[in-house]
């Protein structure tokens, strides 16, 4: 058998049940003690497939065939085929990188491409390469692009036609609903199509809805038919017995309407179904920036999902599929699902790979490499949570976090609980954070305090949301009691009371959201229109961002907050759920940094020791005794960014010297003069800075540096002598005065400006560059107005001067204007 094989066959061909049993027969010959692990993405499918294989083997589930998932397991020492869900497989690989005793791993429904599936495959391909070349990997799907997958993995494809029946496609209520529709609207539209299908065709109905909320609403809308029909919900959190009832074969007498989430798309064959109603919607995992966690959001299905759904109607005979979307919408749908790794939060994946320790994440054999920016964001969070070190290696604390089957944020918060009382509170917080805000975050009736939500969880008795939150909290308490040293002993049915300690919730939230520790500033902002302006308090976060909270919110009485959920609009956020933080807890979480930087606004070098959480400065004090080389390095770095405002580079003398050197470089490239323009001076501050900075630390002091000497310092002594010889700074006039020579890069000649009387007695034009170049004389009137430009004074005196003299005598009669100057 090849090390990696792709198996493709239509839905209902027996991939999920017959193939593992056939492989077990092969193992009995090749490796009698070897085990097979089969990854099944969905809990209900994992349980159902394991039970079906056990039935086909004539055994009870848990003997030779078993299953394992979060909070539920049926296996034994005799189990040879173990069906597991995604998170479980990753945990198995991390805890035992060689998968000792496992001969083969099967990936069922691989087309779903969840992040855990990609993670597990990458780890196993690396394990195959490094430690277990004999480990067999089987990838199964009915709709995957086998050509691409085969090329990516360098393996063969085994295909089977299977048995399928024609399915007619009908359109119903096309595009009445979309991914933005409410749960009630989706349910109402679907219930209408159900009634139509019942009247037009015989057989059981399988109805695909995006989630539990739509299923329950639709079930309520169809309740009037419950006396003559069986209306059966099917979703992941439904009790196992109710799930078995929905997937059991029909009795042949009573028609059934099975209202299902996408869990019935694959692996499960429900006998009696010949009608499928496809809402065209599903719940997909997406990163939720509000909470920093991955959440499910309603989205349009892909074409391969549409094919899978329609195929459910043709498993056992001809069928019909009602699609609640138009052909135009179908044409815009993606061909297949986007791999979750491309858009999901990668924090769990990065922690898993670090805990596994097999290879660097960037070097692993990914089918779809994780986006580098998302990887770096995840590493930054894990570093702030002390889950990994600066080299990306997992810490002991990170190992504990990785062992918990929940998001690292939640794991960090659960592990921060130090007493059973805090553990209960952490479990309640985890339930609230992983679900949607149980209170309307924009309502004026509700503040942002997490304690308001905690109180509601324990006092609101009615409503599916509150029941779901309490159930989730109980699961977290069970999880924490299993892995923690906390002595949690209370009746199963006893509900813990909300915390009386106002600061505890904040400390726990800060463990989950270290980058969202916030400190109030003195700033406020107004939000809203001219009619209703709401005053907002501004907080600065450890991430460096700022966020607003209504000034009327009671939380604004606290200087420090731990922010759980927020939305960003541009560069500023809006706080929705938070808890107050005690000053002592904040002080105990800081790290000391010696910060030396140039404050360009104040024009001063700042040297202070800061107590910080991330980029949030909690306190600071002046820092003394800093070595000069450190100060000089900091100033040199600042000069590269702000140099023109720190130094006197714009002075005429500096500009003229730079022009002079540039002109000499044009005339004599063989001198190899270094660049001396402003950009070159600023970028070379590291070289000249130690000679000129001294003990200066303010802009006013730095502006006293002679920048002409800085420019000259770029040249060697020999180069400077040559420049002085070839391009002098001044020339002497017959009057005894000296005049500057103005050099301009690219000009025809350097210019000397002088009043014409000062040049009386100067027979020839002065020359520079070793006598090779005459300067351009700009002769001025007594009023300093230009009267003549010339590079040939001798000719000027003999010709043009007589005409100029007439005009000057007329305008300046009191001056002496000799005929022969």
For each feature predicted by the language model, list its residue ranges.
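Short, isolated positions in well-ordered beta-strands
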Residues: 165, 547, 738-740
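Charged, non-catalytic accessory extensions
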Residues: 542, 606-821
């Amino acid at each position: 058998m090849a090390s990696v094989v792709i198996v493709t066959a239509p839905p209902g061909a027996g991939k999920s049940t017959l193939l593992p049993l056939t492989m077990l027969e092969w193992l009995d010959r090749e490796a009698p003690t070897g085990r097979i692990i089969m990854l099944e993405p969905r809990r209900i499918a994992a349980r159902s497939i394991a039970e079906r294989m056990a039935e086909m083997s004539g055994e009870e589930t848990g003997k030779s065939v078993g299953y394992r998932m979060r909070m539920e397991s049926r296996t034994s020492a005799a189990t040879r085929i173990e069906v597991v869900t995604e998170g479980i497989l990753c945990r198995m690989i991390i805890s035992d990188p060689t998968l000792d005793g496992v001969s083969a791993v099967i990936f069922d429904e691989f087309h779903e491409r969840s992040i855990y599936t990609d993670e597990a495959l990458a780890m196993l391909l690396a394990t195959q390469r490094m430690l277990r070349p004999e480990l067999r990997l089987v990838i199964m799907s009915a709709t995957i692009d086998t050509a691409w997958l085969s090329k990516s993995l360098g393996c063969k494809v085994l295909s089977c036609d299977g048995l399928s029946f024609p399915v007619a496609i009908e359109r119903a209520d096309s595009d009445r609903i979309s991914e933005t529709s409410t749960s009630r609207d989706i349910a109402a539209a679907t219930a209408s199509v159900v009634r139509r299908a019942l009247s037009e065709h015989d057989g059981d109905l399988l109805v695909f809805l995006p989630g539990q909320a739509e299923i329950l609403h639709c079930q309520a809308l169809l309740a009037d038919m419950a006396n003559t029909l069986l209306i059966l919900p099917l979703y992941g959190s439904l009790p196992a017995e109710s799930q078995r009832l929905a997937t059991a074969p029909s009795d042949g007498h009573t028609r059934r309407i099975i209202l299902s989430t996408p869990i019935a798309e694959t692996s499960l064959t429900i006998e009696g179904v010949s009608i499928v109603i496809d809402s065209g919607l599903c719940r997909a995992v997406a990163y939720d920036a509000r909470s920093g966690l991955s959440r499910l959001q309603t989205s349009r299905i892909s074409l391969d999902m549409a094919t899978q759904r329609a195929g459910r109607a043709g498993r056992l005979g001809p069928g019909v599929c009602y699609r609640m979307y138009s052909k135009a919408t179908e044409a815009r749908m993606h061909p297949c699902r986007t791999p979750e790794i491309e858009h999901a939060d990668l924090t769990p994946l990065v922690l898993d790979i670090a805990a596994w320790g097999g290879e660097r994440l960037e070097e692993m054999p990914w089918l779809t490499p994780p986006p580098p920016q998302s990887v770096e964001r995840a590493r930054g969070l894990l570093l702030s949570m002390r889950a990994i070190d600066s080299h990306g290696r997992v810490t002991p604390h990170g190992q504990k976090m990785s062992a918990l089957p929940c998001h690292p944020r939640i794991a960090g918060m659960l592990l921060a609980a130090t007493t059973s009382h805090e553990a209960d509170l952490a479990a309640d917080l985890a339930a609230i954070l992983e679900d949607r805000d149980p209170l309307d975050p924009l309502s004026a009736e509700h503040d942002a305090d997490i304690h308001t939500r905690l109180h509601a969880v324990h006092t609101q008795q009615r409503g599916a949301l509150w029941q779901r939150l309490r159930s989730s909290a109980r699961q977290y308490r069970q999880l924490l009691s299993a892995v923690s040293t906390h002595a949690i002993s209370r009746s199963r049915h006893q509900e813990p009371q909300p915390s009386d300690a106002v600061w505890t919730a904040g400390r726990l939230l800060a463990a989950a959201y270290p980058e969202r520790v916030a400190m109030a500033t003195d700033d406020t902002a107004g939000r809203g229109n001219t009619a209703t302006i709401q005053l907002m308090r501004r907080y600065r976060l450890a991430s460096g961002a700022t966020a607003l909270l209504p000034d009327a919110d009671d939380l604004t009485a606290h200087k420090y907050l731990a922010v759980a959920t927020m939305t960003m609009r541009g560069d500023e956020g809006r706080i929705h759920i938070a808890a107050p933080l005690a000053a002592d807890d904040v002080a105990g979480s800081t790290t000391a940094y010696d910060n030396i930087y140039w404050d360009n606004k104040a024009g001063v070098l700042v040297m202070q020791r800061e107590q910080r959480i991330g980029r949030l400065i909690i306190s600071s004090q002046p820092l003394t005794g800093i070595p000069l080389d450190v100060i000089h390095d900091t100033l040199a770095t600042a000069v590269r960014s702000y140099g023109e405002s720190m130094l006197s580079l714009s002075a005429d003398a500096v500009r003229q010297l730079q022009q002079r050197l540039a002109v000499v470089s044009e005339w004599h490239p063989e001198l190899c003069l270094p660049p001396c323009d402003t950009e070159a001076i600023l970028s070379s501050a590291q070289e000249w800075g130690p000679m000129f900075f001294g003990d200066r630390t303010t802009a006013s002091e730095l502006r006293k540096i002679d920048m002409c000497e800085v420019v000259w310092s770029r040249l060697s002594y020999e180069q400077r002598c040559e420049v002085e010889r070839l391009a002098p700074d001044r020339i002497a006039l017959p009057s005894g005065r000296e005049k500057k020579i103005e050099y301009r890069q690219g000009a025809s000649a350097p210019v000397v400006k002088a009043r014409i009387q000062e040049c009386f007695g100067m027979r020839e034009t002065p020359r520079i560059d070793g006598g090779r170049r005459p300067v351009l004389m700009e002769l001025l009137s007594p009023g300093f107005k230009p009267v003549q430009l010339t590079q040939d004074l001798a000719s000027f005196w003999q010709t043009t001067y007589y005409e100029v003299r007439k005009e000057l005598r007329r305008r300046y009669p009191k001056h002496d204007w000799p005929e022969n100057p």
